[in-house]
């Protein structure tokens, strides 16, 4: 399940950068950004294939994409943050 909400201001600043890129439709730093997130772990609410998409939240100093992601749903401001590569998710509250 989703573990509640998290204020955008409480997330790493790179999460805001990623949300801004999503809002402007890129360009994204990784070719995998924007791919369909399949929700194989069934942590997010069950939806049809293609409902969710994933984007990398850059980890400074990391040599890979790291473990931080934002998953977007089709609803307005339905953006989830995971800092542990899909083990847990929090809905991002962009008003705080």
From Swiss-Prot:
GO terms for cellular component: extracellular region. Keywords: Disulfide bond, Endonuclease, Hydrolase, Lyase, Nuclease, Secreted. It comes from the Bacteria. This is Guanyl-specific ribonuclease Sa. Disulfide bonds join 7-96. Its EC number is 4.6.1.24. Pfam families: Ribonuclease. One of its GO terms (molecular function) is ribonuclease T1 activity. The active site is at residues 54, 85. It is an enzyme of class 4 (lyase). Belongs to the ribonuclease N1/T1 family. It catalyses: [RNA] containing guanosine + H2O = an [RNA fragment]-3'-guanosine-3'-phosphate + a 5'-hydroxy-ribonucleotide-3'-[RNA fragment]. Gene3D superfamilies: Microbial ribonucleases. It is found in: Secreted.
């Amino acid at each position: 399940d989703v573990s509640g909400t998290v204020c955008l201001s409480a997330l790493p600043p790179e999460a805001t950068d990623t949300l801004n890129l999503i809002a402007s439709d890129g360009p994204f730093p990784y070719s995998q950004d924007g791919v369909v997130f399949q929700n194989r772990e069934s942590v997010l609410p069950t939806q049809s294939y293609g409902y969710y998409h994933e984007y990398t939240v850059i980890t400074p100093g990391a040599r890979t994409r790291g473990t931080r992601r934002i998953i977007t749903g089709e609803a307005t401001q339905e953006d989830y943050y995971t800092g542990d590569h899909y083990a847990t998710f929090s809905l991002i509250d962009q008003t705080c």
